[in-house]
């Protein structure tokens, strides 16, 4: 049975079974939902008194989707054998399909039920990102050259001391990428995350002038740092800045005991080519989309064809 539970029950559930990602944490989820005006629900599948799986969802109207493009759908496995969890997941999604007309999920790397989603009528698209192990900060020669050049040009790196100034630079470089987003809303969101130690901005200066910034998201549960957004200055004037900022971020979080850096995307060839130079591992994840109106139209079309025959 799929049960909707409150935040207190969810917190109890993940305290027992949730050795997972940042994306199951009620504080993170609540900040995200409140800031973007989304609904938030927590679900647990039970068999008798046994809890089998659980997950949170964001929704708007009759659509399940995340307000941001970096939030993964987190599935928490509890009791039972793998077959029970598999069936529980299928039954849970079938239940959600009856309640919502559209479902859009970004699946975690190595999500185990891709075929099950396809069998449930989801269109599953494969995407890529680079994951860099922080115990080995070995890069391509090109990256090392850029870092060495930057070190010779009086650049300095530090944690941001002015969120507003740093965020403004990031926004100007990424507002096309964040199409449809409201600057005030995004500003408020990341400001709240930083106050809760879920996010941080790293700055690069030259002779006192603020040149560029990198916004990262910290998953302290899994010891993963996500290099989410970077401001991009004039590349002809500052060709080595991005390499130095990424290296600073990875070195900093290595010193904090983090294990991995997710370089956040490798789906555009120009971006993937640059990120590949940090010698990370290319990993796959999926977007899964279900739209009931689409399948209703397909069914109607098939029925018309059958009638003709």
Residue positions per predicted region:
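A conserved beta-strand-loop-helix scaffold within acyl/acetyltransferase catalytic domains
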Residues: 2-48, 56-63, 107-129, 135-235
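Conserved GNAT acetyl-CoA-binding A-motif
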Residues: 98-109, 254-264
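A short, internal acetyl-CoA/4′-phosphopantetheine-binding micro-motif in the GNAT/acyltransferase core
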Residues: 71-83, 229-238
């Amino acid at each position: 049975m799929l049960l909707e539970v409150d935040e207190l029950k969810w917190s109890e559930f993940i305290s027992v079974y949730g050795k997972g990602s940042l994306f199951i944490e009620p504080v993170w989820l609540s900040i995200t939902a409140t800031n973007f005006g989304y609904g938030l629900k927590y679900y647990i599948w039970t068999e008798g008194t046994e809890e089998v799986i659980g997950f949170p969802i964001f929704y708007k109207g009759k659509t399940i989707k995340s307000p941001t493009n970096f939030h993964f759908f987190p599935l928490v496995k509890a009791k039972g054998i793998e077959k029970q969890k598999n069936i529980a997941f299928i039954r849970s999604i079938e239940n959600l399909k009856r309640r919502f007309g559209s479902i859009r999920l970004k699946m975690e790397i190595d999500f185990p039920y891709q075929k099950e989603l396809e069998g449930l009528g989801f269109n599953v698209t494969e995407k890529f990102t680079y994951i860099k192990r922080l115990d080995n900060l070995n890069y391509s020669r090109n990256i090392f050259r850029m870092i060495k050049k930057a070190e010779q040009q009086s650049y300095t790196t530090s944690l941001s001391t002015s969120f507003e100034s740093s965020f403004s630079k990031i926004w100007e470089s990424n507002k096309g990428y964040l199409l449809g987003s409201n600057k005030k809303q995004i500003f408020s969101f990341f400001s709240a995350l930083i106050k809760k130690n879920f996010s941080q901005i790293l700055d690069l200066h030259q002779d006192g002038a603020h040149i560029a910034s990198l916004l990262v998201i910290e998953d302290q549960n899994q010891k993963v740092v996500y290099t989410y957004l970077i401001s991009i200055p004039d590349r002809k004037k500052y060709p080595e800045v991005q390499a130095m900022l990424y290296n600073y971020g990875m070195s900093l979080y290595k010193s904090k005991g983090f294990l991995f850096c997710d370089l956040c995307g490798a789906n555009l060839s120009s971006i993937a080519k640059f990120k590949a130079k940090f010698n990370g591992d290319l990993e796959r994840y999926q977007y899964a989309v279900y739209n009931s109106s689409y399948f209703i139209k397909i069914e109607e079309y098939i029925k018309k064809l059958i009638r003709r025959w």
